[in-house]
Amino acid sequence: MRTQFKLICIFTLSICAAGSACKTIKNANSASKTANSSTASSKPDDQGIIHSATGTEKEKPAAGKSNVQGRVLFNSEPAPDIDVKLCEKFNQFLGGCQGQTYTAKTDANGEYLIKDVPPGIYEALTAKVFDTPYYVFATSGFIGSAKYDLEADQTFFAPDSNLFKNDLKLVSPKAGAKVPAQNIEVKWDSYPNAAYYKFSINADSGSGAETNYDYINKRIDGTSYVLDAPLKSGSYRITVNAYNSNDVKLAESPDDMTFTVK
């Protein structure tokens, strides 16, 4: 059975499934660079619009049209046979991609080319995550999705899209566990190709719990950590993320892992 995957946009992103609302999560800062675009394209302007980087066109767009060229990766390696979609409109709460859409599929090098689309502003550029209903935004360094400015007779060179799995196994605390406030051990299974990990423990303030910000995105080189400060009584949600040596996120633990401090 193929492992379920989720999507990634750099720094913070929205995870979406077709026909459903999105939920915001944190992720890694990618250090990878595409062979046919520069990192300049990954940063939006003050209007939230990403402009094309420079690169070598695979082919020229038809007169008056635009092409979109980019790459999809997993673990800093090409991800072939991935469906990519350019969306005229995007609503993260009402089904995602809307309006005119244009599609392509990545080749053996993880590269794609969406050909001959009308120029203008598009609200999403997504890559389907293998055989799951999830997809990723081609964005970097900011919150959420972005808009993309496609110019007539030009190829838009998009930021890399980096995929990650959601199969990192959290060993303790176990989901639904009730634990004492002192000496809580966070432990997880080693993940293939992971160079380091980050864990976050978020409080449900309605339960009386309080977030200790020392335990948000805390980097750990091993696979366990004993909290050096007690947690207040209440309910908490824990996530663990794995990163490779290029600071690219590989995987996260399931997002429904909660425990209670007695």
What are these regions (language model features)?
Residues 9-13:
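Hydrophobic helical h-region of N-terminal Sec-dependent signal peptides
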